[in-house]
Amino acid sequence: MRIIAGTHRGRKLVAPEGLVTRPMTDRVRENLFNILGPHLEDAVVLDLFCGSGALGLETLSRGADFCLFVDADPEAVKATETNATTLRLSDEMRIVRRDALRPGTWIKAPGGTGYTVVFADPPYRLTADEAGRQRLAEMAKRLADLGCLAPGAVAMLRAKRGVPMDRPWPGFNLFDERTYGTTTLYLMEYAGTNI
């Protein structure tokens, strides 16, 4: 696993030990970032269920201003910290070991701005059934209620291939859906209101 492009292009990343995380392949990340390209410069990024931090670190390498990394798994937090130290990106980011499904005021973006890019790469079990997908939608609604999302923010939800997106998250419009091997990426844009 490596940084695909930007100021840290080609730098290797470590992944958390164990079977809890499923790092996104370089090919899938490259395709995702080709889609998100125009949204990355000066972005304020929220990387939920961050695992190794590869998604958020890639945005920082490509010109994002700030990234908040959130994961409840101590091995994931450790891997993200190691990668951030290796890339010398600690000043442009913060790592929080918390449950991403329960956002509170601790998750707000610095300076009162809203996040412009949100990554949600939860365990597949959360996207596998309606109850888990509902919990993710409630998380997105809570982020909006807390004022954490900028109008027009772009969000990516990763799910196992074949998992239907019953409906976009509250306040979001689905604008793209891509499947790569066993992974489907749902891309949504925040409209600025809850539906």
Segments (PLM) and residue ranges:
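Class I S-adenosyl-L-methionine-dependent methyltransferase catalytic core
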Residues: 1-195
